[in-house]
Amino acid sequence: MSGTKPDILWAPHQVDRFVVCDSELSLYHVESTVNSELKAGSLRLSEDSAATLLSINSDTPYMKCVACYLNYDPECLLAVGQANGRVVLTSLGQDHNSKFKDLIGKEFVPKHARQCNTLAWNPLDNNWLAAGLDKHRADFSVLIWDICSKYTPDIVPMEKVKLSAGETETTLLVTKPLYELGQNDACLSLCWLPRDQKLLLAGMHRNLAIFDLRNTSQKMFVNTKAVQGVTVDPYFHDRVASFYEGQVAIWDLRKFEKPVLTLTEQPKPLTKVAWCPTRTGLLATLTRDSNIIRLYDMQHTPTPIGDETEPTIIERSVQPCDNYIASFAWHPTSQNRMIVVTPNRTMSDFTVFERISLAWSPITSLMWACGRHLYECTEEENDNSLEKDIATKMRLRALSRYGLDTEQVWRNHILAGNEDPQLKSLWYTLHFMKQYTEDMDQKSPGNKGSLVYAGIKSIVKSSLGMVESSRHNWSGLDKQSDIQNLNEERILALQLCGWIKKGTDVDVGPFLNSLVQEGERERAAAVALFNLDIRRAIQILNEGASSEKGDLNLNVVAMALSGYTGEKNSLWREMCSTLRLQLNNPYLCVMFAFLTSETGSYDGVLYENKVAVRDRVAFACKFLSDTQLNRYIEKLTNEMKEAGNLEGILLTGLTKDGVDLMESYVDRTGDVQTASYCMLQGSPLDVLKDERVQYWIENYRNLLDAWRFWHKRAEFDIHRSKLDPSSKPLAQVFVSCNFCGKSISYSCSAVPHQGRGFSQYGVSGSPTKSKVTSCPGCRKPLPRCALCLINTGTPVSSCPGGTKSDEKVDLSKDKKLAQFNNWFTWCHNCRHGGHAGHMLSWFRDHAECPVSACTCKCMQLDTTGNLVPAETVQP
């Protein structure tokens, strides 16, 4: 403290009082002014607070440093260090009945007079007071006093003197300290280490020294210029800050050889550094002639593996006032609150507001932290926006094993919730593609199986100029219409559309029955009409009208259909054209559009966007010529690709066009889950290698990991390797011998190594299990488990490399090749480890390595070490 610039201190146990000290001591009381007016004589500190002067003490001249007594004292007991080296106990109260009244006025006098630079009360034994003095060649610079010691004249020389000529009260002058440290050196700063009552950290002239009062002849020290303002982080007692000129040094007492971090300030010298008592790792610094306080936030980082790893810090500056700041003091309990004082004793109450940290979890939970408060954004009861989010949908679908049904592929749309018609169309398309590919491969292997997955666009192009039309009779009507003769390619297209089953039979009856069972009577009637079976269409509509939930309008439509004659200029055609515009169901509309259209002109059916793509394509295959069909399919494909409509996969197949369509779909919805499963279903190798496909797959894998669906991600990887053998990953890790460097598991490979398979170490043909407790190459023993002290090794059961070719390998659940509990596991930092089961059991209750004398926090090195799979947790 300087005699010209004031310092400021909060009372440790009186959170509404603070002391300002320069040439005199002033005690202030802080009051809130939120709901009240400013009292007369009060000083405005901020918009919400004001200070009232309670008392002034001018009895201690030549003050150089002040320290508040750490124990509770309503009269605010203070220790004052003076320019002559004396330490005086004084108070700012007027209660003469205080329990500390016998201490007030007591002086602690060094042997030789010199300036007292710093004072520090012991936080564990509050009666111990350490004083740091300037250098004297024949005296110590660090003196530790006991303010309540009972001295006798035989032990400690004492004398009673008057404080001044006008005073009548006397006090004790104590001249014998408890401890004397730091001979022939100067002490510039002091602080007690909170972890031990008898450890004192001192900033000497050229070094930082840790004194142990149990053995004062020895000290631990490090040479440095940063010896001023030593202070201990209240939340991390091994972290200490000190400064010199414009640099702040951060020390770790566990590795005291050099600073773990050096903070370079402005060219101006520092005057004060202080840790925040309410916030972990927040350090405030002040430079001379500055109105800015710089804050350093020491971020929490994982335990460093390398010796040179520095902690992560966030730096920011705050400006509590416009004038230069002489000193500041953190409030002991209010979060991030401080009082600053200027050289002319103007004070300001200031709060450092925290940055708001947002956290958006993979399961769509939003939380943010501000100071000590943690807030969560919850969804309103009537708000279903979360259910519409694609991430939530993908997570629920993953729980239902969506996409993994490779036998009945169409069922995947049910696993997705059976709500999206595009997904339903997609999975039925993929189901038909798989079904007819297998059927074609059985009939003629390698012929047209791959064409199926290329989509209807490629199928139609392969048959250009090969189809002619012919006249066909209507069923239930004396009329004929032109229909294209169905060659093999058009039949395949109708099969992929789902209208007909596999085989040469083109009967749509089974398809109509399935539509009726699903309640899609309007669609069934339209399909029947497109197949020139007007009688069946009328029958379906009548049945729908007479059902429990039937629509009476279906009877009206059925009656209208029954009056169809095929005449171009009839009143019926005119009325149906008007009725068509009033119908809401798209299939009823296209029925009248078909009946009222001219031969070869079916735009009213083909371009009705509310009708399923597969029905429009099937209609086109029956009624359009090759040229018209190719032109229509090309145009429709481009529309589907641009819109990202999954129904278009029927046209594009799993080709490059399909990837383009899926890219538009992912851009529109973000559904990388469906994109991944779809592309894996039957795409050729060049399509699977497309970087867009790989991007979707890897992003979906990352999503599963982020959701902690590790088992689901493993299932996806297995599913992927089955459908795309080239994606099967190579072995990522193997255990090698420390002596010869060979893999210890080579003996279990499928090909024995020159007759040295592992079976030679046991009895030939013996069913007894052997253990790989030594290297198969050099026979050196493997490391021992840190807990059971048995050599690490995995029981081997029916090892493929050590059995005869005609023997079956037993890989049942009870006799697997390697059980997880017996697997090798070790820490990448300290290299200690053992059986996985033992390690898991140990680290359920411990964070430190089980090996004696090893202090490695093995489990804390991995940030996911304490996570558990979340696949059983319902959202």
UniProtKB/Swiss-Prot annotation:
Zn(2+) 1 binds at C737, C740, C775, C778. One of its GO terms (cellular component) is GATOR2 complex. The GATOR2 complex is negatively regulated by the upstream amino acid sensors CASTOR1 and SESN2, which sequester the GATOR2 complex in absence of amino acids. In the presence of abundant amino acids, GATOR2 is released from CASTOR1 and SESN2 and activated. It is found in: Lysosome membrane. Zn(2+) 4 binds at C830, H832, C849, C854. Keywords: Lysosome, Membrane, Metal-binding, Phosphoprotein, Repeat, WD repeat, Zinc, Zinc-finger. WD repeats lie at residues 61-100, 111-155, 182-221, 223-261, 265-306, 395-437. Zn(2+) 2 binds at C788, H835, H838. CDD domains: mRING-H2-C3H3C2_Mio (cd16691). A zinc finger (RING-type) spans 782-863. The modification Phosphoserine is found at S759, S766. A zinc finger (C4-type) spans 735-781. Zn(2+) 3 binds at C827, C830, C858. SMART domains: WD40 (SM00320). GO terms for biological process: cellular response to amino acid starvation; cellular response to nutrient levels; oligodendrocyte differentiation; oligodendrocyte progenitor proliferation; positive regulation of TORC1 signaling. Component of the GATOR2 subcomplex, composed of MIOS, SEC13, SEH1L, WDR24 and WDR59. The GATOR2 complex interacts with CASTOR1 and CASTOR2; the interaction is negatively regulated by arginine. CASTOR1 and CASTOR2 convey leucine availability via direct interaction with MIOS. The GATOR2 complex interacts with SESN1, SESN2 and SESN3; the interaction is negatively regulated by amino acids. Belongs to the WD repeat mio family. As a component of the GATOR2 complex, functions as an activator of the amino acid-sensing branch of the mTORC1 signaling pathway. The GATOR2 complex indirectly activates mTORC1 through the inhibition of the GATOR1 subcomplex. GATOR2 probably acts as an E3 ubiquitin-protein ligase toward GATOR1. In the presence of abundant amino acids, the GATOR2 complex mediates ubiquitination of the NPRL2 core component of the GATOR1 complex, leading to GATOR1 inactivation. In the absence of amino acids, GATOR2 is inhibited, activating the GATOR1 complex. This is GATOR2 complex protein MIOS. It comes from Pongo abelii. The gene is MIOS.
